Curated annotation (Swiss-Prot):
Organism the protein comes from: Francisella tularensis subsp. tularensis (strain SCHU S4 / Schu 4)
The protein, known as: tRNA(Ile)-lysidine synthase
Gene: tilS
Catalysed reaction, written as an equation: cytidine(34) in tRNA(Ile2) + L-lysine + ATP = lysidine(34) in tRNA(Ile2) + AMP + diphosphate + H(+)
SUPFAM superfamilies tied to this protein: Adenine nucleotide alpha hydrolases-like, MesJ substrate recognition domain-like, PheT/TilS domain
Function comment: Ligates lysine onto the cytidine present at position 34 of the AUA codon-specific tRNA(Ile) that contains the anticodon CAU, in an ATP-dependent manner. Cytidine is converted to lysidine, thus changing the amino acid specificity of the tRNA from methionine to isoleucine.
Places the protein is found: Cytoplasm
Free-text comment on this protein's domains from its UniProt entry: The N-terminal region contains the highly conserved SGGXDS motif, predicted to be a P-loop motif involved in ATP binding.
UniProt superkingdom: Bacteria
EC number(s) reported in the record: 6.3.4.19
Residues given in the record as ATP binding sites: 25-30
InterPro entries reported for this sequence: Lysidine-tRNA-synth_C (IPR012796), Rossmann-like_a/b/a_fold (IPR014729), TilS/TtcA_N (IPR011063), tRNA_Ile_lys_synt (IPR012094), tRNA_Ile_lys_synt_N (IPR012795), tRNA_Ile_lys_synt_subst-bd (IPR015262)
Main location: cytoplasm
Length: 398
């Protein structure tokens, strides 16, 4: 199957974006995507993320910049810091890239982020998730489209193979760079791409297409499952708390899936299999006062007949005087202490940051400002007249 430029363009136009943001590495995938997308009468911004790992990374950045100048497209480059010690580079870099993309997207009314993932990427991701022992959500792989907090991300080339993309580039004389670090098998994805996939192709020459189809089936099944679970979760919840007596009426497998969904909906984080098993055991033998630390940030408690998410730190751990002193220094107005409320952060808390037109979830702001996860647990929410006016010790809202 050859790439249909008209189909790709029509798919992008279907979302009626105000602006198009392209993750542009200079490789063949993003170069083809840029070449096609530039034909749209929609403002386009190409973003190059410099990982500072390869000797030629600056040359690649210049290549991308010159290509954008040639087509009169806006170009933005962003340089990543060194990966924190002990973290996986692949996972860390992916989070950093997406955080920067979303930071740029916040500037526009209805942005659409385009990424150049293709069928072979999907097949590799399926294998990576299978090796990890992932469930349906993981095996679903890379989503074709995903709604973001502000805008969405679309992968128009996901149904096309790498060979088809390279063929399109050759046919249309599209210049692109080649990253020889893609051959380095110390990275798991490269090992799968360069050694495992070729072996599987001996069994099934169309293995990438087959695995991609399996990922799509898993995605469809997971979507159905999540809708059914969400409906059931609503019937056994009270605000953000889970009613234990209603939960334990259900089959064990449904209980475990609901525990995972409940925690993720309220924290945007996933429970590990071991934690789900421990929680499942606890709710079926409930004891008021039981608790488990999920991370440095969250705890889950049993209180009477409810499962409750709490935060390990409390206001007493930080001097209220310190918080008020910080607020006085940073807020350019008189403070009526009788109207000030200080509490822990909640998952849905939002803040209108530095003159923005509308508020953003704190999780998004923490990512944009690159506040380490380990530091976020210190956050205290300061309210006045039931409105968030500051997040101690990080920033003022409004």
């Amino acid at each position: 199957m050859s790439i249909s430029k008209s189909l790709v363009l029509n798919e992008i136009k279907k979302f009626s974006p105000s602006h198009i943001i392209i993750g542009y590495s200079g490789g063949v995938d993003s170069s083809v995507l840029l070449n096609i997308s530039k034909e749209l009468d929609i403002p386009l911004i190409a973003i190059y993320i410099n990982h500072n790992l390869h000797r030629d990374s600056l040359k690649w950045q210049i290549h991308c910049q010159q290509t954008c100048q040639k087509y009169n497209l806006q170009f933005i480059s962003h340089s990543l810091d060194k990966v924190p010690k002990g973290e996986s580079f692949e996972a860390w870099a992916s989070k950093q890239r997406m955080a920067f993309f979303q930071k740029i997207m916040q500037q526009y009314s209805k942005p659409l982020l385009l990424l150049g993932h293709h069928q072979d990427d999907q097949a590799e991701t399926f294998l990576i998730q299978a090796i990890r022992g992932s469930g349906l959500a993981g095996l679903a792989g890379i989503p074709h489209y995903k709604e973001l907090h502000h805008g969405g991300v679309l992968r128009p080339l996901l149904k096309y193979s790498k060979i088809e993309i390279e063929g399109f580039a050759k046919l249309n004389n599209i210049s692109y760079i080649y990253d020889d670090s893609n051959e380095d098998i110390k990275y798991r994805r490269n090992l799968i791409r360069n050694q495992i996939i070729p072996i599987l192709q001996q069994v099934n020459p169309n293995i990438s297409q087959t695995l991609s189809r399996s990922a799509n089936i898993c995605a469809e099944s997971n979507n159905i499952l999540q809708k059914l679970l969400t409906e059931r979760l609503q019937s056994i919840s009270q605000d953000t708390n889970l009613i234990i007596s209603e939960l334990i009426k259900l089959d064990d497998d449904i209980q475990k899936n609901l525990l995972h969904l409940w925690f993720k909906q309220n924290t945007q984080q996933s429970l590990k299999s071991k934690q789900i098993k421990e929680l499942h055991l606890a709710v079926n033998n409930p004891s008021t006062g039981w608790q488990i630390d999920i991370s440095n940030y969250y705890q889950i408690h049993i209180q009477y007949n409810q499962l409750i998410i709490k935060y390990p730190t409390t206001i007493n751990d930080i001097s209220k005087e310190d918080i008020i002193s910080w607020l006085s220094k940073n807020l350019n107005e008189e403070i009526d202490l009788t109207k000030i409320v200080i509490r822990d952060r909640k998952p849905d808390d939002k803040c209108k940051y530095r003159g923005r037109n509308k508020p953003n979830k704190l999780k998004i702001l923490f990512q944009e400002l690159q506040i380490p996860t380990t530091e976020r647990s210190k956050a205290k929410i300061i309210l006045k007249d039931q409105q968030i006016i500051a997040v101690y010790p990080f920033f003022i809202c409004g």
